[in-house]
């Protein structure tokens, strides 16, 4: 890949992609479904050159010991970050199978010229009690808030609640040396052992800028073409200074790291907060500047009136390649369904 801006990324979930009988897969819902020629052919017909796979590490809610039982989750409930999810393997009870089949999947996609981007969720754990982090060093890996003192990043803060910028009951403390080291070693492991081509950071705004920049530098040592981007926001207020957070507004401070552009997304299809409202794609006026901001790639441009851009009143990208353009993802309706609900009388 000569330039990150040349990527056309298809977000997918292992089970969703091949579980339906119409997929005619020998391995429905499994890693190996992405080794089958007809499934790879389908991806190629879409014109994509990269797949962004929803969390593929070992997560909490699916019971791997009952493969015959219909179970489903996106995977944003991390358990063990550095091992593939067993329910996507053909034999979760045999440890090496999930490892081998994940590698077979990556190899097959690479052979077809398709890059593999892994969705990673280092910003929180499924549970605090019983988590590997908490068992190793209680209350070190998680931020807490102190009553009457606002947000606090102090190690071992007592009397406060666990901070919850993830909306899932906790948030990890990426700014602390051992958590930072864990993240650095984890991404390096996925690249060196499984040959992953990039990472999509869930709720990247919870992490600190310094850690994200160190991750970029660490991966550059291996392969500068490895892609890094993420959600430049959080589900709440992180318990560290906002100016330290890897938010979308701070993308220009993170060279080589991109952020999802919700300005252009909602300008094209309508606001995320109301599925019945349409926008530019329906011929609605008032969204032109937001669309133009997306076209120039989130950088400062004399042709864009930032006062009329939704969500952002200042450019946030230093390079257009940091601006991740999209119109739909797993968090909302597909574009087709979104247009159906927001444009009365629209036909297929």
Language model features: what each stretch is:
Residues 1-5:
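Basic K/R-rich, polyanion-interacting modules in nucleoproteins and related proteins
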Residues 13-37, 41-194, 204-223, 227:
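Substrate-binding/active-site clefts of carbohydrate-active enzymes
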Residues 216-218, 222-348:
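Conserved alpha/beta catalytic core and glycan-binding cleft of carbohydrate-active enzymes
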Residues 9-14, 327:
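Active-site-proximal beta-strand elements of phosphoester/diester hydrolases
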Residues 6-9, 78, 225, 323-324:
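A residue-level signal for beta-strand positions that form part of recognition/binding surfaces
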Residues 197:
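Extracellular, beta-strand-rich glycan-interacting domains
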């Amino acid at each position: 890949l000569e330039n990150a801006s040349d990527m056309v990324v298809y977000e997918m979930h292992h089970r969703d992609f091949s579980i339906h009988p119409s997929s005619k897969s020998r391995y429905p819902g499994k890693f190996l479904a992405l080794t089958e020629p007809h499934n790879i052919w389908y991806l190629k017909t879409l014109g994509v050159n990269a797949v962004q796979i929803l969390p593929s590490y070992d997560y909490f809610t699916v019971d791997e010991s009952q493969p015959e039982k219909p179970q489903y989750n996106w995977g944003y409930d991390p358990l063990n970050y550095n091992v593939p999810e067993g329910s996507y393997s053909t034999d979760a009870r045999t440890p090496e199978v999930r490892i081998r089949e994940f590698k077979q999947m990556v190899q097959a996609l690479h052979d077809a010229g398709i890059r593999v981007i892994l969705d990673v969720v280092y910003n929180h754990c499924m549970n605090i009690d019983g988590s590997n982090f908490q068992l190793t060093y209680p209350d070190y890996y998680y931020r807490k808030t102190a009553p009457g003192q606002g947000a606090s990043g102090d190690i071992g803060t007592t009397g406060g609640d666990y901070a919850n910028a993830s909306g899932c009951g906790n948030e990890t403390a990426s700014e602390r040396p051992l958590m930072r080291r864990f993240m650095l070693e984890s991404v390096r492991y996925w690249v060196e052992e499984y040959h992953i081509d990039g990472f999509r950071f869930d709720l990247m705004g919870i992490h600190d800028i310094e850690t994200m920049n160190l991750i970029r530098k660490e991966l550059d040592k291996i392969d500068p073409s490895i892609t890094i981007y993420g959600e430049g926001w959080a589900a709440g207020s992180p318990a560290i200074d906002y100016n330290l957070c890897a938010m979308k507004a701070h993308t220009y401070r993170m060279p080589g790291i991109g952020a999802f552009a919700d300005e252009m997304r909602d300008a094209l299809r309508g606001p995320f907060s109301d599925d019945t409202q349409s926008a530019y794609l329906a011929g609605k006026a008032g969204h032109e500047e937001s669309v133009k901001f997306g076209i120039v790639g989130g950088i400062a441009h004399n042709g864009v009136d930032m006062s009329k851009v939704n969500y952002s009143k200042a450019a946030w990208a230093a390079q257009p390649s940091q601006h991740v353009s999209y119109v739909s993802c797993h968090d909302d309706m597909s574009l087709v369904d979104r247009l159906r609900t927001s444009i009365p009388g629209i036909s297929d």
